[in-house]
Design a protein with these regions (language model features):
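Catalytic core regions of nucleotide second-messenger enzymes
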Residues: 102, 131-148
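S-adenosyl-L-methionine-dependent methyltransferase catalytic core, i.e., the SAM/SAH-binding region
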Residues: 156
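Inter-domain helical "communication" segments and dimerization helices
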Residues: 3, 17-20, 26, 116-122, ...
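Conserved long alpha-helical elements within nucleotide-processing catalytic cores of c-di-GMP signaling
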Residues: 26, 30, 39-58, 65-95, ...
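PAS-family sensory domains and close relatives that share small-molecule sensor folds
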Residues: 114, 149-151
């Protein structure tokens, strides 16, 4: 009986360790370790999980300006800090119910659910105000970005991937 209890305890302990290891692996696979935001793999997974968008949804693509210049002139640690600052500003400006991710080096996306032109404008206005406050606070590296957006109600049978591609195109 004691041997059986010891075996059960050992198997339970092993199962808990495996579960924790799996969660850590999933986090590494889907979370940008620098910003804590979902990474490109998670963004791509989101694109594939939504076949056709049924409710008004928007995708906003953001591209940080001058990151290469900051990296080249002030060093990559300052560039990393700039990325982290923008990620925080963006996450704080987009409602918690919506998705924010880091798509690549200096590119971020926001997926806004139950979106309208007004809600998109409100998010972008809030982000601009927060960015101006941050830049006026006295930091020597300024946050600057470009953005483009697309709203599902403007297209028939639209996928999230289609919205992303259109928003990315509208950025330029």
């Amino acid at each position: 009986m004691i041997g059986l209890v010891a075996t059960i305890i050992e198997q339970t302990t092993t199962a808990v360790k495996v579960s924790k290891a799996n969660k850590q692996l999933e986090k590494k696979a889907y979370v940008d370790l620098h910003t804590g935001l979902p990474n490109k793999s998670k963004c791509e997974e989101l694109f594939h999980t939504v076949e056709f968008i049924k409710s008004p949804t928007a995708c906003i693509v953001f591209d940080m300006n001058n990151l290469k210049h900051v990296n080249d002139s002030l060093g990559h640690s300052m560039g990393d800090q700039l990325i982290l600052n923008f990620a925080r500003l963006l996450r704080n400006s987009v409602p918690a119910k919506d998705f924010v991710g880091r798509y690549g080096g200096d590119e971020f996306i926001a997926v806004i659910y139950d979106a309208s032109r007004e809600s998109i404008a409100a998010i972008l206005t809030d982000l601009q105000k927060e960015t101006e406050k941050f830049n006026n606070y006295g930091t020597h590296i300024k946050v600057s970005y470009s953005h483009g957006w697309a709203l599902s109600t403007d297209y028939n049978e639209c996928t999230l991937r289609t919205l992303f591609d259109k928003a990315d195109k509208y950025m330029y």
